[in-house]
Curated annotation (Swiss-Prot):
Species name: Synechococcus sp. (strain CC9605)
GO molecular function: proton-transporting ATP synthase activity, rotational mechanism
Role noted for this protein: Key component of the proton channel; it plays a direct role in the translocation of protons across the membrane.
Protein's recorded name: ATP synthase subunit a
Compartments reported by the entry: Cellular thylakoid membrane
InterPro entries, sorted: ATP_syn_F0_a_bact/chloroplast, ATP_synth_F0_asu, ATP_synth_F0_asu_AS, F0_ATP_A_sf
SS bond list: none
Gene: atpB
Membrane topology designation: Multi-pass membrane protein
Entries under HAMAP family matching the protein: ATP_synth_a_bact (MF_01393)
Location, primary (coarse class): membrane
Length: 241
């Protein structure tokens, strides 16, 4: 007796279909740009509303924004140091807020209401292009911080405490952006796929605990990325001991 193939609902889940914009010979990932612009617009709107008519004793949205500001300031100060953290606070804050809003937006915003010719919108951080770009920005910030502070003496850290460490230090510079980008990308993509499969299989109650866990891990991933970014910048600024 031949077995008939059963149309499993989760077979509709596909990865790999994307919307591309062509500018000359350059192809841009349109889905990432669109979702990023939407989330940045939401973030800017929240900030503008929360900072309008600020009071000495904050309440409501202003209170939340001041809490986030103090939280990000502590991350930067603890890892970069009291002397230099103010210069890097906008960079660290931008990374944290963009990743946090992207992760939560990917889980909470009903992206399917936006119809595209191909593919669908989702969390920008679930795309490897976004996470690699941010990781490379952190690497550039690390080198800029070190070279602007120490000049060519910055490269002494590659041969400290002994020149034997040179190849290992060079390998480390490649593993930093790789670990930053793939950790964030893997966690967010896995969460979206897991929730998507569960929604197709049992669309009512079962996916809720997984979604709540995903929101928690998404916030943790934003914290880890911002903490490591500030740590790397602090490492470039301070003298090796």
């Amino acid at each position: 007796m031949a077995l008939l193939p059963l149309p499993l609902p989760f077979a509709e889940l596909e990865v790999g279909h994307h919307l591309y914009w062509q500018i000359g010979d350059l192809y841009l990932h349109g889905q990432v740009f669109l979702s990023s612009w939407i989330l940045i617009g939401i973030l800017l709107a929240v900030v503008l509303v929360g900072t309008r008519g600020m009071k000495r004793d904050p309440i409501g949205l202003q209170n939340l924004l001041e809490f986030l500001w103090n939280f990000i300031r502590d991350i930067a100060r603890d890892n970069i140091g009291e002397k230099y953290y103010r210069d890097w606070l906008p960079f660290i804050g931008t990374l944290f807020l963009f990743i946090f809003v992207s992760n939560w937006g990917g889980a909470l915003i009903p992206w399917k209401i936006f119809e595209l010719p191909e593919g669908e919108l989702g969390a920008p951080t679930a795309d490897i292009n976004t996470t690699v770009a941010m990781a490379l920005l952190v690497s550039l910030a690390y080198f800029y911080a070190g070279l602007s502070r120490k000049g060519l003496r910055f490269f002494e850290l590659y041969v400290e405490p002994t020149p034997i460490m040179l190849p290992f230090k060079i390998i480390e510079e490649f593993t930093k952006p790789l670990s930053l980008s793939f950790r964030l990308f893997g966690n967010i993509l896995a969460d979206e796929l897991a929730v998507g499969v569960l929604v197709y299989l049992v669309p009512l109650i079962v996916p809720l605990p997984v979604m709540l866990l995903g929101l928690f891990t998404s916030a943790i991933q934003a914290l880890i990325f911002a903490t490591l970014a500030s740590f790397y910048i602090g490492e470039g600024l301070h003298e090796a001991h």
